[in-house]
Design a protein with these regions (language model features):
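Extracytoplasmic small-molecule ligand-binding "clamshell" domains
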Residues: 1-50
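Short loop->beta-strand "edge-of-pocket" segments that line small-molecule binding or catalytic clefts
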Residues: 5, 86-100, 114
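Short helix-initiation/N-cap motifs at beta->coil->alpha
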Residues: 9, 24-37, 81-82, 98, ...
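Extended ligand-binding regions for polar small-molecule ligands
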Residues: 9-18, 80, 93, 98-101, ...
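Alpha-to-beta junction loops
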Residues: 20-22, 40-49, 92-93, 111, ...
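Beta->alpha turn/N-cap motifs
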Residues: 27-31, 42-54, 77-78, 99-100, ...
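Flexible hinge/capping segments at coil-to-helix
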Residues: 64-67, 76-94
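Periplasmic-binding protein-like
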Residues: 68-76, 140, 144-186, 204-206
């Protein structure tokens, strides 16, 4: 149908309902354009797309309270035997989504490997599946969903605890909106809506 689907889509729809609003979506945007888009204003009020709250991003935009913990995951072909150590060599290609914390993690922790930043998560995971890439470093919630839905031949070789969390990005010019979003998120936690959405998409309350 062309309509966006996913955990974040269900989440923002539920948030909008709590606020008495309707959500409308911009056409697909590259991940690394989202924070600049919100900062400049005019096109979108909020961005929700698995955006990790980081010091650099907080300088540009405001964030709601976190709505999901997000560690990183190293995803490999099942039974490949690949590990963090085995990937840190010159002939290994490790994919990531451009501009993400996974992108940064590869640079810092797998400096010998060839980092391959891509715009599309599905293309990156398909590359791991076909052997084009040895691994992908990706947010664990995204990996959990994608491996369950589409990539049963892949597995998480390692979970990387990062202490990272997702938040909804909001322009610094709209503090009242951030406050209203926080209230809606808190209501969803207390009435079970958040738990239901997490269980629907991840199979459990991750």
């Amino acid at each position: 149908t062309g309509e966006p689907v996913g955990f974040d889509v269900d989440l923002i729809a539920a948030v909008a309902k709590k606020m008495g609003l309707e959500s409308s979506y911009l056409p697909n945007q590259k991940f690394d354009t989202l924070v600049p888009l919100i900062k400049q204003g005019g096109k979108a009020d909020v961005a929700i797309a698995g955006i990790t709250i980081t010091d650099d991003r907080v300088k540009e935009v405001d964030f709601t309270e976190p709505y999901l913990d997000s560690n990183q995951a190293i995803v490999v072909k099942k039974d490949s035997g690949e590990t963090e150590d085995s990937l840190n060599v010159a002939d290994k290609k490790v994919a990531c989504q451009s501009g993400t914390t996974g992108d940064d993690w590869i640079s810092e922790n797998l400096p010998a490997a060839e980092r391959v930043p891509l715009d599309d998560v599905t293309a990156a995971l398909t590359g791991v599946s076909t052997g084009l890439y040895s691994a992908m470093v990706i947010d664990l919630p995204v990996a959990s969903y994608m491996l369950t839905q589409s990539f049963s031949d892949l597995e998480v070789a390692k979970e990387i605890p990062t202490g990272e969390q997702y938040g909804i990005a909001v322009s610094k010019d709209q503090p009242a909106l951030t406050e209203a979003l926080n209230k809606a998120l808190a209501d969803m936690e207390s009435d079970g809506t958040m738990k239901d959405i997490k269980t629907k998409w991840f199979g459990s309350e991750i």
